[in-house]
């Protein structure tokens, strides 16, 4: 099977610099210019470029300012002689607005897909049993114009390739041992080799030609093959070459065996499963650096960009790593038919689930106070496999994972009375209930995200807002951070008997960007339960009503273990509170070395792990979730038509919907909210109708026979709107580290009516944006991460089918398929509403699902 598609991908509405802002005129955004010059060094740089005196603490602009004695930029205009060289050059890669004053949108750049699949199956009936050999091959290539999942751009010009090949081979044997006894055996091997996010657009432009410095104060190019337009994240868009390209080869060997024995009234099953996994990764994760610009200095992100004042700079380095995993599971169950109308199922499953380990022990964790014996010069707390009490899996593999499952099915029957109306006679209805525990293996991502952590790698995160051209120099006071790149890593034969002391930990302190795996983690599990009633209304109609629920326990979550002390940072946030020449504390500066006005030196304002650590997070099994749903279906199956109607009313709550969402270190339940995937109401109808052209025209031939219409109709409420505040005004410093796409911060909400609007055609926002505001400095926003919903779905997919029978064994089928048949604008999706309070598009519906798509298909059967 081969697939070739070329489809334009819409960017949605993106806020870009207006024509006035591209010339340095910010009078239209003057209200956002609330910042002050953060230090004496920056004041000196500005003075040199502007030709007039600028002082630390001076406002960049105040309302009505027209004199250089009152503000840095009179008239809210930034002259070009003060622009940074990188900003001047990179401005050419940012698209100009094409939809209003500061909006950009296009679908002119396509995603191209080539996907080729092939399979082969051979069956043989032998004295060994029914043997089946199956082989499957999938070779694909995708050119994505907006590779945002790889940290890539959301504007045109920076596409990336993802390509690879999957192969699966399985051998199965079903052997019967007399009546009622069967054994099923399966063994297989899966190989998945792929390259993810290989940059294509934006290459061939050196960092030096863009204006970035080299040497100790600049960016060391560690991946010259991917050197190109520098990656920069703004509140509303990302530009530049993708930063998380990798080559990944996965191998899985699996086998299972199930033995079944039927002896009335019991059906017994025993069996087991085993799989062995390899994940071999060769990443290029931020090897050439990335900037985050949020408006930390002036209050306006694009003004900061022109001035060359990013919020932070990140660069990583690391070696290939090779993850390993084993799983073993055994089970036994009995289906006991107690009576003809009553069945009881019970079973028990035992699972031995291991966290991933690394072939060369290139993993680590943090235990306060512990000193590594494998790396004796490591900072206290940083330990690795081989250190006392630290297994290769970091957390122990526990053998006590027993999971019971219970179920009952009862078919009541009554011949008369009110119960007959409800349940009908025997066989017309059924009542089912079940309960089960299900353990969940740790994802490979839990180990993979520990890549680029000392001593096996390093992620540099600027301790204070730096300069764009020289990102290892602090903008506020000119302090030069040590540039550790390139890094020499330890050999693979390090052990307690062969310790290693040559890694220079002093060059990577404070250690930041470390999402370490907690050494006391438990295996996550869920408790699932359901109760259902099924009633046959007519011989062709079946009604089902169910309650379905589950609870997740010991779920893996990410939480900061070294957050900033908000009160301390706030007390050091004003120039009068610090010594002359010292930087102040503020957003993204929680790791700065600050000297107070009383000459007390603070090596950052973080609490928990000490000054040797910056922003680090723990992956801990401390989260939970809850899901409850009412599910109803109505099924009709007739001679010429059929339909299935389904409605679900549900609610899902969790503390984090994925590893990219942090938990609140001050209150673990503080992030508990509706899940990112929660869908309150969901109605789906699928149907098929034989078109009676033969009866209408009273002719039965190839022209009138074989016509049918099928389709799927869906009406549902939208997904929740996720709220963010990327300003770090909370002063917690919960910065991104490779898995956290956003900070913990959320806006403030004043409790006013939300005024939900799901139709952007009326020009209104999706909700009342006036009810929200950026965080107050030193305080975490009070808005829940998610508590209301965006636009829903109103969609029809239709298929017109014509079957032509050529002979008894040959037929030709024609299909006309229409997706979103009525071309209804679907403002639906997890990111359809902008929830970033600092983005000018905050509260706007910025994207829509695909428009109508028509597809013709022909199938020849023989």
Can you annotate each of these PLM segments?
Residues 141, 356-401, 652, 657-673, ...:
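Catalytic cores of eukaryotic secretory-pathway lumenal/extracellular enzymes that build
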Residues 1-2, 118-137, 169-177, 181-189, ...:
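Membrane-embedded beta-strands that build the outer-membrane beta-barrel scaffold
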Residues 41-43, 47, 51, 71, ...:
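Short, solvent-exposed micro-motifs at the edges of structured domains
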């Amino acid at each position: 099977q081969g697939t070739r598609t070329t489809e334009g991908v819409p960017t949605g509405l993106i806020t870009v610099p207006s024509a006035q802002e591209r010339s340095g005129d910010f009078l239209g955004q003057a209200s956002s210019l609330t910042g002050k010059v953060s230090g004496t060094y920056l004041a000196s740089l500005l003075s040199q470029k502007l030709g007039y005196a600028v002082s630390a603490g001076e406002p960049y602009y105040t309302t009505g300012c027209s004199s250089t004695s009152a503000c840095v930029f009179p008239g809210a205009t930034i002259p070009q002689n003060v622009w940074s060289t990188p900003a001047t050059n990179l401005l050419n890669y940012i698209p100009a607005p094409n939809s209003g004053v500061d909006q950009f949108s296009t679908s002119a750049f396509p995603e191209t897909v080539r996907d080729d699949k092939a399979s082969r199956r051979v069956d043989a009936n032998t004295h060994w049993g029914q043997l089946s050999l199956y082989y499957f091959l999938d070779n694909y290539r995708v050119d994505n114009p907006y590779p945002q999942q790889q940290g890539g751009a959301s504007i045109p010009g920076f596409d990336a390739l993802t390509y690879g090949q999957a192969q699966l081979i399985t051998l199965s044997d079903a052997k019967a041992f007399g009546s009622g006894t069967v054994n099923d055996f399966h063994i297989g091997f899966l190989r998945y080799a792929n390259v993810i996010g290989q940059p294509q657009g934006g290459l061939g432009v050196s960092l030096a030609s863009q204006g970035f410095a080299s040497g100790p104060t600049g960016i060391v190019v560690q991946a010259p093959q991917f050197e190109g337009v520098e990656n920069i994240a703004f509140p509303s868009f990302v530009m530049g070459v993708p930063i998380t390209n990798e080559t990944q080869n996965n191998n899985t060997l699996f086998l299972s065996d199930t033995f079944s024995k039927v002896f009335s009234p019991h059906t017994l099953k025993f069996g087991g499963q085993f799989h062995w996994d390899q994940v071999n990764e060769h990443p290029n994760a931020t090897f050439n650096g990335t900037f985050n610009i949020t408006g930390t200095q002036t209050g306006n992100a694009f003004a900061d960009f022109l001035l060359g004042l990013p919020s932070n700079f990140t660069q990583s380095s690391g070696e290939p790593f090779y993850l390993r995993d084993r799983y073993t599971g055994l089970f036994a169950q009995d289906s006991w038919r107690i009576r003809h109308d009553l069945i009881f199922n019970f079973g028990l499953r035992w699972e031995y689930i291991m966290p991933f380990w690394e072939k060369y022990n290139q993993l680590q964790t943090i235990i306060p106070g512990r000193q590594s014996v494998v790396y004796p010069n490591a900072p206290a707390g940083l330990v690795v496999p081989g250190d006392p009490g630290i297994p290769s899996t970091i957390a122990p593999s526990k053998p006590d994972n027993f999971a019971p499952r219970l179920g009952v099915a009862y078919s009541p029957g009554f011949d008369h009375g009110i119960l007959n109306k409800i349940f009908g006679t025997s066989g017309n209805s059924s009542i089912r209930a079940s309960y089960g525990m299900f353990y969940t293996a740790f994802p490979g991502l839990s180990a993979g995200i520990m890549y680029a952590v000392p001593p096996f790698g390093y992620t540099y995160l600027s301790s204070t807002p730096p300069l764009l051209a020289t990102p290892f120099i602090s903008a506020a006071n000119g302090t030069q951070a040590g540039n550790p790149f390139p890094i020499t890593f330890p050999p693979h034969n390090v052990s307690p008997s062969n310790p290693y002391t040559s890694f220079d930990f002093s060059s990577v302190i404070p250690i930041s960007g470390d999402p370490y795996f907690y050494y006391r983690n438990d295996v996550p599990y869920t408790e699932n339960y359901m109760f259902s009633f099924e009633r046959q209304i007519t011989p062709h109609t079946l009604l089902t009503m169910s309650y379905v629920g589950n609870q997740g326990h010991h779920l893996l979550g990410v939480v900061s273990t070294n957050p900033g002390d908000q009160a301390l940072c706030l007390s050091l946030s004003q120039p009068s509170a610090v010594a002359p020449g010292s930087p102040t504390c503020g957003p993204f500066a929680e790791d700065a070395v600050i000297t107070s006005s009383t000459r007390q030196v603070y090596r950052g304002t973080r609490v928990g792990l000490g000054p040797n650590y910056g922003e680090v997070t723990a992956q801990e099994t401390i989260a939970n979730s809850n899901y409850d749903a009412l599910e109803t279906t109505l099924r009709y199956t007739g001679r010429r038509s059929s339909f299935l109607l389904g409605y679900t009313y549900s609610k899902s709550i969790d503390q984090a919907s994925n590893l990219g969402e942090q938990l609140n270190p001050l209150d673990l339940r503080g992030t508990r909210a509706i899940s990112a995937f929660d869908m309150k109401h969901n109605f789906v109808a699928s149907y098929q109708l034989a078109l009676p052209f033969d009866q209408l025209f009273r002719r039965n031939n190839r022209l009138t026979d074989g016509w049918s219409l099928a389709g799927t109709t869906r009406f549902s409420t939208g997904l929740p709107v996720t709220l963010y505040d990327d300003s770090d005004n909370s002063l917690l410093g919960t910065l991104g580290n490779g898995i956290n796409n956003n900070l913990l911060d959320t806006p403030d909400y004043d409790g006013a009516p939300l005024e939900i609007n799901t139709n952007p055609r009326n020009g209104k926002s999706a909700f009342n944006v006036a009810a929200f505001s950026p965080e107050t400095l030193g305080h975490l926003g009070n808005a829940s991460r998610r508590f209301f919903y965006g636009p829903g779905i109103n969609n029809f997919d239709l298929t017109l089918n014509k079957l032509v029978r050529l002979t008894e064994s040959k037929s030709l089928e024609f299909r006309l398929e229409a997706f979103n048949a009525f071309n209804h604008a679907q403002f639906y999706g997890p990111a359809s509403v902008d929830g970033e309070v600092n983005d000018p598009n905050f509260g706007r519906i910025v994207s829509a699902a695909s428009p109508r798509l028509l597809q013709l298909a022909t199938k020849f059967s023989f």
